[in-house]
Amino acid sequence: MPTPAVRFERVSKRYGEVAAVDDISLDVEPRAFVALVGRSGSGKSTLLKTVNRLVEPSAGRVLLDGEDVAAGPAPMLRRRIGYVFQHVGLFPHMTVAENIAIGPRIAGSPPPDMARLLDLVELPRAFAARRPAELSGGQRQRVGIARALAPGAKLMLMDEAFGALDPVTRDALGRRLRDLHDELGLTTILVTHDMAEALLLATRVAVMEEGRIVADETPAALLAGAGGEAAQALVAVPRDQARRLAGL
């Protein structure tokens, strides 16, 4: 068995009396695409952020390629991980190229291949000279993905990265993310509230409820009825929407 790309070993995170993450153990194999789904407040984003140490566990540990993420400085760890979130946080005074290249620049690494990165996220190369204010929301998210890829990261953490986008742009970006995952041999963990998105993009779907993982199944297994009550309640939403649309 290969060493898991990410391993959660009995990870918990408490805020006072509240367990946001409650004793979770989970392996994410290399090149897997895992979606974390669940209702708001179920602990998805908190669990994700324990990987890049934006959240420190109250108990347990997280391993990246077999090494404890807490073993070294957090900034060094984050250079190995791509992270894209809903409000992508581009620097408004910098050009697109400068935003994309900031990680390697801070690390003292050679400049990334800007043309290749823009091609990967399907942005015109001329956009390198633009500033974030000149971009649409979808274009800014594409820049965010390029920035996450610039240091050569093989692990991508996506925290509701497409949540603020219109449905057409969201679908296009989701498809491109899955293509990049396959083309570049990435390991991807995606937090999403959209069950249809999870089923269409992921190779595994982990369902969270009250800080615990209550189901861990393939999309096909979930669609066939596996995973239990909480998982099937989420699967029922896109199914019901499809039935209602068919009846119009």
Label the model's feature ranges.
Residues 131-135, 139-141:
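Conserved ABC ATPase signature
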Residues 111-126, 179:
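Conserved ABC ATPase "signature" region
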Residues 210-211:
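Conserved ABC ATPase "signature" C-loop
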Residues 68-82, 106-108, 132, 222-226:
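ABC ATPase NBD coupling module
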Residues 216-217, 225:
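ABC ATPase "signature
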Residues 52:
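Helix-to-loop junction immediately C-terminal to a conserved catalytic motif
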Residues 127, 148-149:
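ABC ATPase C-loop
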Residues 150-154:
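A short, proline-enriched helix->beta-strand linker immediately N-terminal to the Walker B motif
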